[in-house]
């Protein structure tokens, strides 16, 4: 009987810890369903880091997507080894293709004769998407965009 009591107390403590852990788990608010370009309309802020035509650098891009997944007001503020601090306005960001699971391709212009093709993955709740350049020679960019 005495041995049973020694086992019951730790068992109760473990059970209470499990109940507490389950109660504190945050449930996902991600919506289920197909992701479309229209889901992404609105203001975005994207950060990029990597190696490009100006060497290693970072860039902050702001843009407003319309319901078709296009923006013509992209502003890029960059800081790089080769070009220093620059600002480029009137650029485009366009979602070229987007699968129902949020995987797709986007294009970002950065002035005359300058642009990137980015692979993207939209989060299930449509609040962010990551980007990576895996197609443009000598450009190695990665980043994330946040819906504002």
Predicted regions and their residues:
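Coiled-coil-like amphipathic alpha-helices with heptad-repeat character
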Residues: 1-4, 21
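Bacterial N-terminal signal peptides that target proteins for export
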Residues: 3-14
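Mature soluble binding/inhibitory domains
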Residues: 24-148
